[in-house]
């Protein structure tokens, strides 16, 4: 073989080896691509950040967690059997209130994508607590936030996000179209109640596990409305209170018993001279207690308690430590409506302990500012204004707003009692501040039988925003 033939032979061999190597590399790339496609083909669309999604399959919770690793989402599942939130325990004995959450939504919303909201509330399942809120179909610091002081519009929706997080399009879940709402968990699925429609014919849409299961039509054709806080569940049944009729006179009030999203029973209260709006309800020893707003003529709060058959009792908190706003200075109370400064009002709550009562209220007697918790050891039945504990929550120089109760069941906490908790809305913007919008953040506390501290946890946002200038 001459030198030229040797060169040609060696070159041919090298070319063959190179072609084979190239084909192997192409095959390797195709194999990796096919393997990746099979692995991720049945998963949800990639998200820009980590998130948890809970679905329901045959009364079993499936907790799906997406973990973002090198732009690839790996899905892990952990099935958790559903339970029944019994609600048969008593409220836990407490000596004060420990801070639980604060979302700082307005502060974050000056630069980030945060919903314009009002009427936030918290509700817990046996696995998690979520903040529910009524959006205005707009973001803070955006042109669509203009005019959001309005309570009822077709753009308002009930949404929810993990407790303590600022409500944004990236962490929030749509629940219902609503300008008045409630929600609660029976241990198997979430029940949501969303009211929308015209003032003279609104309809409440009930959803169970996200599916429409029932509706309730306005029966007085005068702004059907509900709690703006969580409904209460006992032994698989959930209970809510609705109002239909004048906000400044005698209206109609109904209790609804709901099972798996279907109304199974309702009772209209026989309550002349009473006014119930925006009730804050909680379970206690198998029964339900609701503390409400009298927007007609009471500066103390009306209550209704009932058993699972909807057999009920009604009254007003007797204490001379008045809980509504506006209200007179503390003095001599009444077990009926206290008339001075009794018109108008604000959503609030109290927790009954025997003859005693924890009263949550604004610090100001005539504006929605400040917040405090007061323990009146005889206030449920006694009319004096003596109290033994006062815990500061928000200073009188800072804005507050609505407040309401929620509970954490033993199935969540591992305690042998129902833990009482509350949230406070921190309203900012119109009508008290020079902005084009109205919105709020929230803070929450839970009752404990250990050390606590009073302080001020205000909203803290610096206004006006860029859109307001």
Swiss-Prot record:
Keyword Transcription in annotation: no
Activity regulation, per record: Inhibited by the neuraminidase inhibitors zanamivir (Relenza) and oseltamivir (Tamiflu). These drugs interfere with the release of progeny virus from infected cells and are effective against all influenza strains. Resistance to neuraminidase inhibitors is quite rare.
SUPFAM superfamilies the UniProt entry points to: Sialidases
Topological domains, Intravirion: 1-6
Any further remark recorded for this protein: The influenza A genome consist of 8 RNA segments. Genetic variation of hemagglutinin and/or neuraminidase genes results in the emergence of new influenza strains. The mechanism of variation can be the result of point mutations or the result of genetic reassortment between segments of two different strains.
Family per record: Belongs to the glycosyl hydrolase 34 family.
Protein name: Neuraminidase
Source organism (scientific name): Influenza A virus (strain A/Duck/Hong Kong/2986.1/2000 H5N1 genotype C)
Upper lineage: Viruses, Riboviria, Orthornavirae, Negarnaviricota, Polyploviricotina
């Amino acid at each position: 073989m001459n030198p030229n033939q040797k060169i040609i032979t060696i070159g041919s061999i090298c070319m063959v080896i190179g072609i084979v190597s190239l084909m192997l590399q192409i095959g390797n790339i195709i194999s990796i691509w096919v393997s990746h496609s099979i692995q991720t083909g049945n998963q949800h669309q990639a998200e820009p950040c980590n998130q948890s999604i809970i679905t329901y399959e045959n009364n079993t919770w499936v907790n799906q967690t997406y973990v973002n690793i090198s732009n690839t989402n790996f899905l892990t599942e952990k099935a958790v059997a559903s339970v029944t939130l019994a609600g048969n325990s008593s409220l836990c004995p407490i000596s004060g209130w420990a801070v639980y959450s604060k979302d700082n939504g307005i502060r974050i919303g000056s630069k980030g994508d945060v919903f314009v909201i009002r009427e936030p509330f918290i509700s817990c399942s046996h696995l998690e607590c979520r903040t529910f809120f009524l959006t205005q179909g707009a973001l803070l610091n955006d042109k669509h936030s203009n005019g959001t002081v309005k309570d009822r519009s077709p753009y308002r929706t009930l949404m929810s996000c993990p407790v303590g997080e600022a409500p944004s399009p990236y962490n929030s879940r749509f629940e219902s179209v609503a300008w008045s709402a409630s929600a609660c968990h029976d241990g198997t699925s979430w029940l949501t109640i969303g009211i929308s429609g015209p003032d003279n014919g609104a309809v409440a849409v009930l959803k169970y596990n996200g599916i429409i299961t029932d509706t309730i039509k306005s029966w007085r054709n005068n702004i059907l409305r509900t709690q703006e806080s969580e409904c209460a569940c006992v032994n698989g049944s959930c209970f809510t209170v609705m109002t239909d009729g004048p906000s400044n006179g005698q209206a109609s009030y109904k209790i609804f018993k709901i099972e798996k999203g279907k109304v199974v029973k309702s009772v209209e209260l026989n309550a002349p001279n009473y006014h119930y709006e925006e009730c804050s309800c909680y379970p206690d020893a198998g029964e339900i207690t609701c503390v409400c707003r009298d927007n007609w003529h009471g500066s103390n709060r009306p209550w209704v308690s009932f058993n699972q058959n909807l057999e009920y009792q009604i009254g007003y908190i007797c204490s001379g430590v008045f809980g509504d706003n506006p209200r007179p200075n503390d003095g001599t109370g009444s077990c009926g409506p206290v008339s001075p400064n009794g018109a108008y009002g604000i959503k609030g709550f109290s927790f009954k302990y025997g003859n005693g009562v924890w009263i949550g209220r604004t610090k100001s007697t005539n504006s929605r500012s400040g917040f405090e918790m007061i323990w009146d050891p005889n206030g449920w039945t006694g009319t004096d204004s003596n109290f033994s504990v006062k815990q500061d929550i928000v200073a009188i120089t800072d804005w507050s707003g609505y407040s309401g109760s929620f509970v954490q069941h033993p199935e969540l906490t591992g305690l042998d009692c129902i833990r009482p908790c509350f949230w406070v809305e921190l309203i900012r913007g119109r009508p008290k501040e020079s902005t084009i919008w109205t919105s709020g953040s929230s803070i929450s506390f839970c009752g404990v039988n250990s050390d606590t501290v009073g302080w001020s946890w205000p909203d803290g946002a610096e206004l006006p925003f860029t859109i307001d200038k």
